[in-house]
Amino acid sequence: MPNVVVVGAQWGDEGKGKIVDLLTQYADVVVRFQGGNNAGHTLVVGGEKTVLHLIPSGILHPGKSCVIGNGVVIDPEVLVLEIDRLKAKGALKDDGQLVVSLDAHVIMPWHKAIDVAREQAMGEGKIGTTGRGIGPTYEDKVARRGLRIRDLLDEARLARKVKERAALAREELARLGAKLELDEPALVKRYAELGRRVAGYATDVSIWLHRALQQGKSLLFEGAQGTMLDVDHGTYPFVTSSNTVAGNAVVGCGLGPTAVDYVLGISKAYSTRVGGGPYPTELKDETGERLRKLGGEYGATTGRPRRTGWLDALALRYAVRVNGLSGIAMTKLDVLTGFDTVKIAVGYRLDGKVLDEMPSDPEVIERCTPVYEELPGWTEKLEHLRTWDDLPPRARAYVKRVEELAGVKVVGCSVGADRGETILVENPFLAR
């Protein structure tokens, strides 16, 4: 069995969790390699909804191992809460089902305080952070002053690092006109207790995964957010604080690039975005609101309404290039049922010219207007369909046109929220 990376091909919220949940049956191990609890995966299995923010989606499959890699930033309060909820459901047992990297960095209370204070200070220039401390935690990681999971397991070391870092945080918050109310001894005790709660799951993930590969096990790497939010390749500065592209999958868990055999990009049949930043196909009219309502486009983590728009073929083609996508899975195709026409942006108009590739400068993207290609819509319900040939001809034509514009095969379509409401044309785990 090959090893497969699943990444978002848009601005996040593409439905990666559902596709990972579907593909987990073919993998032995599911690996989360970046991001934090700013991501939310909503899974519906047998009509029951489960929302996960840190633990990989594959945890709902008995007999599978789930790994949180060194590239993830962890709020231990959230991690322990998810562990407790999954245990209560009987979905998590203490048998090696969950593995957490000792080297994953820890989100501390000052990271959240700094995140919120900075966003408030930016006024109209807000990036749209979730306020969960993700960015400041990654900053501390790069500045070599962060705390890691392993630090929670040594209370004396934890106390020393908390004292050093809290002092710096107070200085920064004072410059932002904010204060950090912190009882350091109580904080150390609380985080040491959280450390004891996760100690049984914590290990050297690089060694653990290397041994899994030696045993012939197959890996499924689960990305968070999306390509257009990548800190290097997204619409900077309106991005997240980590690399969301496929190349980071192995970096974020301690393996080499030869561990990856197939890269699957997830794209909605339309598009959405949360927070600020350029979004050429955004619809601020009744059509946009219709997409929002039909698609349930409200954040799994924040609950805030998502911006909505037509599919952007330039952005999708960009995602194909920077991820080296082997195939695309299209989600929420059913949401487009009932539209008289459906549109795809096939170019951008800028200063009297038509561009066929997405500009690298977000300020230039802001000045672009989309050039649309219109296709006839369909009225048939899709939720009960299970094969490609069952799809209405117009829905098939839409998918094939997206495939042509993206330059890579659409290997699956989601036609409903439940795990089973999916048409898989080509299984990435059986593609080689």
From Swiss-Prot:
GO BP term (any one): 'de novo' AMP biosynthetic process
EC assignment: 6.3.4.4
One function term, GO molecular function aspect: magnesium ion binding
Coiled-coil annotated spans: none
Positions that bind GTP: 12-18, 40-42, 306, 332-334, 414-416
Localization, UniProt: Cytoplasm
Any Pfam family hit: Adenylsucc_synt
Xref: SMART domains: Adenylsucc_synt
Pathway entry: Purine metabolism; AMP biosynthesis via de novo pathway; AMP from IMP: step 1/2
Cofactor(s) listed: Mg(2+)
Protein name listed in UniProt: Adenylosuccinate synthetase
Organism: Anaeromyxobacter dehalogenans (strain 2CP-1 / ATCC BAA-258)
Annotated gene: purA
